Structures are given as C-alpha cells and as structure tokens.
Amino acid sequence: KYGYRATRELTGHGVGKELHEEPMISNVVVGPASKTPVIKLGQTLAIEIIYVEGNPKLILEEDGWTISVKDGTLSAVHEETVMVTQDGCSILTVPSLFQIV
C-alpha cells in the first residue's frame, strides 16, 4: 500500500542455547505452506522484519558488520521475541521507546 518491501536476505530465527538457531523464519512467502518451518510448543523465536523504501537488496559494509540497503533508500527493522505456548504465544520483548538511529 505504501510502497515498502520486506527483504528476503535476512530472516527471523529460533533462539535457544545459541542466539541464531533453526528454524529460519522468512519475512516473505517463499514457497508452499508444506515447506515452511513447523513451529513447536516451547520454542522461542525472534521475529525480525526489515522493510525498505526501494529495492530490498542489501549489502554488507566494509566493517564486516553493518548491513545497508544497496540503493541507499531508507530502511527499518521491527523485532519481537516470542515463546510458543499452549495458548498461542507469549511476547518476551520488553517494550521501549522508539529510537531513530
């Protein structure tokens, strides 16, 4: 509706003994539902959505850490950490004030 796109290059993921674990959770539909990860009771998941104003291609900057939008347009990320429960999910992320970086 507003022209923003979700990037395919970064994903949400499971969180456990390691920060980044399976399942990888895509920001966009990439195949049939039968091929999407199965979410299980007790799993903790980081749901990360990166929106971009222009082309969603990303680049890794020379510092080896910073990721930018290749065409230089604006981008934003929203992330929530949730735990799958018997009743659905519990949001574990602590609310904070928005910070423009």
Label the model's feature ranges.
Residues 1-27, 34-37, 43-56:
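Conserved, well-structured core segments that form or line functional sites
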